[in-house]
Design a protein with these regions (language model features):
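C-terminal motif of bacterial Sec signal peptides marking the signal peptidase cleavage site
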Residues: 15-18
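Repetitive, compositionally biased segments used for assembly/scaffolding
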Residues: 23-323
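Structured alpha-helical
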Residues: 12
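Bacterial N-terminal signal peptides that target proteins for export
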Residues: 1-8
């Protein structure tokens, strides 16, 4: 049996976009990165409330960047790039008959979509490939064009400093308090997301839950990634609403060979793509959480539930001293 690696999850919400333009082929991920082994160090980290961070949170636009179109992508020189898609988090496309990828997307232009569906010009300012087990995580600095024609960073960290993003296929429903829809991952083949560093979507990829990768059992980690975005935000009800505050400690583990449990903390709950399958009274909410119509599975925390739909189990130090 392969030894599991444990991490305690953290998410401070921020969003980023990016894509670049030099000429560099993405490295083929090693088997080690493909099965997402040992991707995160052991340690206690912090959670956060936002799914994709401070995305265009300004008075000029008054809306959020919810997705980015693959169609009509253009190179830095303005030429249309055809067949643009993501291989992992690296862009691939064609400039005529020439295949372009990796840093060749520096300066590329994309069309983003705001919450009301209106378009927003985006520009990839820089592209950088990750290293080691994260060599398949490409980082992008992305700007949007304001009404005055100037370019501003799409993503900012908690201190307001510009930050980068990871590109990931599909889009999310950012609404909160919407049963059955809020917080959902939408597998839209025409769109992708620029996931800002520090927010749940990007954070969960750094934990090893890369949607394009597979676990030690050979199964896709896409479901684990989505479950992680729910868990990090304490979206117990699966309606997109967070039941925590930034800076709460949380530990998570799985049976996929990505994160293992070494903490002796209190059980919080079990998670799948739709939210919590069950949870205890000792949660990061520090108050009672009620989900209308929710029926918890029995024997919460039983690790045999990993065989019947549970993706992750979370623990909190609620009531534990010495932290």
């Amino acid at each position: 049996m392969k030894t599991l690696q444990r991490v305690v999850a953290a998410c401070l919400a921020v969003v980023a976009v990016g894509c670049g333009t030099e000429s560099s082929e993405p490295e083929v991920p090693s088997l080690r990165s493909q099965v997402a082994e040992l991707v995160s160090p052991n340690g206690r980290n912090l959670n956060g409330r936002n799914l994709n961070g401070r995305n265009l949170n300004n008075s000029e636009l008054g809306s959020m960047l919810v997705s980015v179109d693959y169609a009509d992508a253009r190179s830095a020189s303005g030429k249309v790039l055809n067949g643009v898609r993501l291989e992992g988090s690296a862009f691939v496309g064609f400039d005529g008959a020439t295949r372009v990828t990796g840093t060749a997307f520096t300066g590329a232009r994309f069309t983003g979509r705001l919450g009301d569906g209106s378009p927003l010009p985006l520009r990839v300012d820089s592209v950088a490939q990750g290293t080691g087990v994260d060599s398949d995580l490409w980082s992008y600095r992305v700007s949007y064009q304001g009404s005055d024609g100037s370019w501003r960073a799409v993503c900012q960290d908690a201190n307001g400093a510009d930050t980068s993003a990871i590109a990931v296929a599909g889009r999310w429903d950012y609404r909160q308090g919407v049963p059955g829809e809020g917080g959902d991952k939408i597998e839209d083949a025409s769109a992708f997301t620029f996931a800002c560093e520090g927010a749940a979507i990007a954070k969960c990829m750094h934990f090893g839950y890369k949607p394009w990768a597979t676990g030690a059992d050979g199964q896709s980690l896409a479901g684990h990634h989505q479950a992680c975005t729910r868990m990090v935000r304490a979206d117990f009800c699966g309606d997109g609403e967070s039941h925590t505050t930034d800076g709460q400690w949380v530990n998570l583990y799985d049976a996929a060979g990505v994160q293992g449990d070494t903490e002796s903390w209190s059980l919080e709950g079990e998670w799948n793509e739709d939210g919590a399958r069950c949870f205890t009274s000792e949660t990061r909410a520090h108050t009672a959480v009620s989900c209308p119509g929710f029926t918890a599975i029995p024997d919460c925390g039983d690790t045999t539930h990993f065989q019947s739909g549970t993706r992750l189990i979370s623990e909190t130090p609620y009531g534990v001293t010495g932290l």
